[in-house]
């Protein structure tokens, strides 16, 4: 049951009673539990967002209701916990973050499932993925050692690898990453992959030591909006050729490859790196990895020369390159005129790639397979 004090706070906050507060009132508001971050607490019923002071719902630092609950639980703010649950926050998110037995008991009294810590953690992780709740997931798992340790080590890595494994192989060394860092990078990568702008901005502000990693991730996943933002608005810079080597590793990454090319990466070097990557990684039939081979085709469409001495030397070493030798015959692969311009505006880049894909006249790989037999 909610106390009169909690109900009174609810009414005052919903009616924006403190929107024009005086600075001298800040101490009193803090003591009464009516303060959030840098100002009087506010709540938007429509957006289900908790704000502080003049903060708007769209601000990077605003909190969705479940995140606000997690923060209140971590800080043992009893009245705010009750208030957020009254507004509709999911109390099970709170119980997994409770640091004291008293707060855990309060969560149970407010409706949390006592068995959730034993049976609900995996389902919660998957649900957060489905709902794309990146910041909520990081609030719950990051620095929550007791929760991370409750995962069986094998099961934990199986769960993370479900989405993250190939990425780790190409960008991180998993054996050197703690569970804590792995969880953070898992969700950070997820935000970049789906271009979730608010989580990306929030995490960029909170974890500046990962700025280079963020740019690499954006390149690897072909998120040209984030590459542009990091490169030109935040001045995060890496060698374009190194960025290109990352872009080439991700299947069918036309956006990432083109953007690195537009930034000045050497397209012949990119093709050489791709062929070496194929030699190292792919010992399977040609058509089982169409995505990587399509990157080869795209590099040539951008003007890469498959007849350089280095590339020809690589091709001569292995019989498995017979099909690639066929692809490199004159007339079969050639530069595409629409890709000659180097454009850096993300929306224009997407238009160019879309037009390229529409006007592409290259024979389908399936027909080539028939010709090779």
Curated annotation (Swiss-Prot):
Function: Plays a role in virus cell tropism, and may be required for efficient virus replication in macrophages.
Protein name: Protein MGF 360-6L
Similarity section: Belongs to the asfivirus MGF 360 family.
Example GO BP: taxis
Native organism: African swine fever virus (isolate Pig/Kenya/KEN-50/1950)
Domain of life: Viruses
UniProt-listed InterPro entries: ASFV_MGF360
């Amino acid at each position: 049951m909610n106390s009169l004090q909690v109900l009174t706070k609810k009414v005052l906050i919903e009616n924006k009673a403190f929107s024009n507060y005086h600075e001298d009132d800040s101490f009193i508001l803090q003591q009464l539990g009516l303060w959030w971050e840098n100002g009087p607490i506010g709540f938007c019923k429509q957006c289900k967002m908790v704000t502080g002071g003049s903060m708007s719902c769209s601000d990077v630092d605003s909190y969705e209701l479940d995140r606000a609950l997690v923060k209140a639980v971590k800080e043992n703010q009893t009245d705010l916990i009750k208030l957020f649950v009254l507004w509709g926050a999911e109390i099970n998110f709170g119980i997994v973050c409770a640091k004291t037995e008293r707060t855990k008991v309060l969560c149970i009294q407010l409706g949390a499932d006592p068995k959730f810590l034993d049976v609900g953690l995996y389902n919660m992780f998957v649900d957060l993925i489905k709902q794309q709740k990146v910041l909520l997931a990081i609030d719950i798992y990051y620095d929550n050692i007791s929760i991370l340790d409750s995962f069986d080590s094998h099961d934990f890595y199986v769960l993370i690898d479900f989405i993250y494994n190939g990425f780790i192989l190409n960008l991180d060394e998993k054996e050197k990453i703690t569970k804590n860092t792995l969880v953070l990078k898992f969700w950070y990568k997820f935000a970049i992959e789906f271009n979730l702008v608010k989580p990306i901005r929030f995490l960029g502000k909170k974890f500046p030591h990962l700025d280079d990693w963020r740019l690499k991730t954006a390149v690897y996943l072909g998120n040209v909006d984030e590459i542009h933002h990091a490169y030109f608005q935040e001045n995060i810079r890496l060698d374009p050729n190194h960025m290109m080597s990352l872009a080439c590793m991700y299947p069918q990454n036309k956006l990432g490859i083109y953007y690195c090319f537009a930034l000045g990466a050497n397209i012949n070097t990119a093709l050489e790196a791709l062929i070496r990557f194929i030699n190292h990684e792919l010992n399977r039939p040609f058509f089982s990895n169409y995505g990587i081979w399509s990157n080869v085709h795209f590099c040539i469409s951008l003007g890469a020369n498959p007849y350089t001495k280095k590339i020809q030397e690589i091709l001569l070493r292995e019989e498995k390159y017979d099909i690639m030798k066929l692809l490199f015959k004159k007339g079969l692969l050639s530069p595409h005129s629409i890709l000659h311009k180097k454009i850096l505006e993300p929306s224009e880049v997407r238009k160019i790639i879309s037009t390229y894909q529409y006007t592409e006249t290259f024979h389908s790989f399936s027909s080539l397979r028939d010709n090779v037999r």
